[in-house]
């Protein structure tokens, strides 16, 4: 069957979130003119959090995560690790020069009518779709790698500017073992 860019991006977002269910949003929070939050997409409670005395006298707050676990965290991390290879060695390698921790997957439909890229960092999943409302070829050699990856690269470079580079979160019990690509050792 068919899917949408939003559903596909949500699925990749689930992987990078350790296999936990996510709900995409366009608006995360709305505050009134006095700084009071009147809408918050993230409904998790922060029990015991109080900023009245400032944060310095409190331990780091812990948010209760009640999201459904959709896949095993280890399996999700393995998928993320494989998709990281798309950036390092595959069809997304043109943006590896950004010096960010990224992963993703390109896609191109038959006859090059659509090109897409779903990419993510440890904190943000983004879907890019390039195509016409009435399907027709994008052009010779126009693929997800050539039309969608550069758009993702421009966006993620801007969105990540000034933020610390962090690795993908590895669940407990996962050991990384380097394997030589030619010898398998």
Where are these predicted regions, by residue range?
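A penicillin-recognizing enzyme superfamily signal
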Residues: 1-185
